[in-house]
A protein has these predicted regions:
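N-terminal Rossmann-like NAD(P) cofactor-binding module of classical short-chain dehydrogenase/reductase
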Residues: 1-3
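Predominantly a Rossmann-like dinucleotide-binding segment in NAD(P)-dependent oxidoreductases
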Residues: 51-154
Length: 154
């Protein structure tokens, strides 16, 4: 089994290598930061399924007791029809590793990957994905329309 907890920008390549090596995979979310990465992950996930390799993504809320209970209540029609919803992610910054004089730009970005879109995606991709996943899970389908706003690079 391979556990992928590297920065998301590298995950599609690591996932591809693990699947080609015949390994089962747990990988953190997000699984990629761009469309080519997503395409690679989808392709390799199909191969993994054909080869009966297990792949699990770290969408943690699906394993939290209170979320499981709410999902069960929704499935058992205890809350009525859900006709719309909103999900939010509000957060301040996370860790920052100050630049050291001897560091290259690449090393600095690697150590602070959360702040570089090519490595992280952005805070919506990196963190808000949990709330988007919960909305899809509770509704039981994917949205036909969505809207988002925010920013970190302002």
């Amino acid at each position: 089994m391979v556990i992928l907890t590297t920065p998301p920008g590298f995950r599609p390549h690591h996932f591809e290598y693990a699947i080609q090596a015949g390994k089962h995979v747990f990988m953190e979310k997000p699984v990629a930061t761009d469309v080519p990465g997503i395409r690679k992950v989808l392709k390799m996930a199909k191969i993994a399924k054909e080869n009966k390799q297990n792949v699990v993504v770290g969408l943690q809320r699906r394993y939290q007791k209170n979320y499981i209970e709410i999902a069960s209540q929704i499935r058992d029609d205890k809350v009525g029809d859900i006709v719309s919803g909103q999900v939010y992610w509000n957060s301040a910054g996370v860790w920052v590793h100050p630049r050291k004089p001897e560091q290259t730009e690449m090393e600095y970005q690697m150590r602070n990957w959360y702040y570089f879109n090519w490595l992280c995606g952005d805070h919506i991709l990196e963190q808000h994905i949990h709330n988007i996943d919960v909305a899809n899970w509770f509704i039981g389908e994917y949205p036909i329309a969505a809207q988002g706003m925010g920013g970190r690079e302002v």
